Swiss-Prot record:
GTP 2 binds at residues 199-206, 246-250, 311-314. The keyword Signal does not apply. Belongs to the TRAFAC class TrmE-Era-EngA-EngB-Septin-like GTPase superfamily. EngA (Der) GTPase family. This is GTPase Der. GTPase that plays an essential role in the late steps of ribosome biogenesis. It comes from Pseudomonas putida (strain W619). Residues 367-451 form the KH-like domain. One of its GO terms (molecular function) is ribosome binding.
Length: 487
């Protein structure tokens, strides 16, 4: 399971700066989701090959009222969701009563935490450590988030305390043994295809899960890795194994009350990253809302195969249905590769067809293709539509190979590849999707330049080659001398 790290501290200690530094770009921020405080943000981050989810919480002072009190409550809830907490303090301002209150809360909750003394610029690190030692959080790690100083030491300390899962360890072993670290995932014998059911609260996720499982089944499977993990529900259908990753919480047959279903961003993001296929559930009567776009964007960024289920389709008038379909085409253009199903989870209409799309999307996401096949498609695409000229020179694309899966990563080699326009990349992506008959999965294309790998290198001759070269040169000199003597 992907670990969750929360940034906590009073206002203006540099949490957002640290968040943007670790996520590397503001584009990684999922954004302000409806129903959550605007100061609470979630991002997908990685450090030296290890992925984690980062939470930027609102500031906590201890004397909040009104809306600020609600924000502080949300920040404290984020602490509960996290595997690890980075407790940021301001080295310039020194220790405050708010810092002491937060430290006390972390101790009471028995949370694993590291004290981070931020804004250490032009301040003696030892003095800063001594300043905050009364907090009882151990030695503070000094950093300057705005400049990136101390970040390496901080992340090594944090990730060193979080155990690696089996997949990470296996990948590390492959790298250590010199094998190509490209993992082509497939359904394990135990889990089958892992399906994450995601969507906003009250769109019908719980009803859909139970409908797909069968009403006669009592859903009591609870295999959490931590106290806030999603519920994993293994089952079989038509001799195929599946595992639902359910973010709606534990429920039993006949006891589903979706109006009180709680939505957890962390659970949803973790479910997306751990799944093979995402079934994204929307409420047809509400249409497409910004919250839907945020969640779909994260699923797309994670590279997951996607199936869209538009629930509560029954009972809608013809005109309403036409309007919703128009809105889907207009607003979901960025996931136009995904199958869309119009269903009623309550009555079961159209639910059975979801399995076919899940199978097709998963197959498209993990199928291997040989280099010869991918290169032939590239050559045909280039013949039909040449890359543009750049400064009078034609961009040359030479060959392609598979670089990864789930999502498919196609690596294309050539010259001037850094100058390929986005429009031509989209053309190649659409060509691969059409020829390979891919459905339900995003495609990523990566370009490699045509640098000569032997440039600047000299061949080293063996002793045998040196002797042979010497004999040939001697023979050549003797032959040349004879020709001169004959003249």
């Amino acid at each position: 399971m992907v670990p969750v790290i929360a940034l906590v501290g009073r206002p203006n200690v540099g949490k957002s700066t640290m968040f943007n530094r670790l996520t590397k770009t503001r584009d990684a921020i999922v954004g302000d989701l409806s129903g959550l405080t605007r100061d609470r943000q979630y991002g997908d981050a990685s450090w030296q090959g290890r992925s984690f989810i980062l939470i930027d919480t609102g500031g906590i002072t201890g004397d909040e009222v009104g809306m600020d009190e609600k924000m502080a409550e949300q920040s404290l809830m984020a602490i509960e969701e996290a595997d690890y907490v980075l407790f940021l303090v301001d080295a310039r301002a020194g220790m405050t009563a708010a810092d002491q209150m937060i430290a006390e809360h972390l101790r009471k909750r028995n949370k694993s935490a590291i004290l981070v003394a931020n804004k250490i610029d032009n301040i003696d690190a030892d003095v800063a450590r001594a300043e905050f030692s009364p907090l009882g959080m151990g030695n503070a790690i000094p950093v300057a988030g705005s400049q990136g100083r101390g970040i390496n030491q901080l992340m090594e300390s944090v990730l060193g305390h979080i155990p690696r899962d089996a997949e990470e360890e296996a990948l590390d072993q492959e790298v250590a043994e010199g094998e190509e670290a490209v993992r082509i995932p497939g359904p394990s014998e135990k889990d089958g295809i892992k399906i994450a059911i995601i969507g906003r609260p009250n769109v019908g996720k719980s009803t859909l899960v139970n409908r797909m499982l069968g009403e006669e089944r009592v859903v009591v499977y609870d295999q959490p890795g931590t106290t806030r993990d999603s519920i994993y529900i293994p089952f079989e259908r038509d001799n195929e194994k599946y595992t639902f990753i359910d973010t709606a919480g534990v429920r039993k047959r006949g006891k589903i009350h979706e109006e009180v279903e709680k939505f957890s961003v962390v659970k949803t993001l973790q479910a997306i990253k751990d799944a093979n296929v995402v079934i994204f559930v929307m409420d047809a009567r509400e249409g497409v809302v910004d919250h839907d776009l945020n969640l779909l964007g994260f699923a797309l960024e994670a590279g997951r195969a996607i199936v869209i289920a538009l629930n509560k389709w029954d009972g809608m008038e013809s005109g309403e249905r036409d309007y919703v379909k128009t809105e889907l085409e207009r607003r979901l253009f960025f996931v136009d590769f995904a199958d869309i199903h119009f269903i009623s989870a309550l009555h079961g209409t159209g639910v059975g067809h979801l399995y076919k799309s899940v199978q097709a999307a998963f197959k498209s996401a993990v199928t291997r293709w040989p280099t010869s096949r991918l290169t032939q498609i590239l050559e045909d695409a280039v013949s039909e539509h040449q890359p543009p000229l750049v400064n009078g020179r034609r961009i040359k694309l030479r060959y392609a190979h598979l670089g990864g899966a789930n999502p498919p990563l196609i690596v294309i080699h050539g010259n001037q590849t850094e100058k390929i326009p986005k429009s031509y990349s989209r053309y190649l992506e659409n060509t691969y999707r059409r020829v390979l008959k891919l459905v339900g999965t995003p495609i990523r294309i990566e370009y490699k330049g045509g640098e000569n790998p032997y440039e600047g290198k000299k061949n080293t001759l063996t002793d045998r080659q040196v002797n042979k070269k010497r004999r040939l040169m001697s023979h050549h000199k003797k032959a040349e001398k004879k020709r001169r003597d004959k003249r």
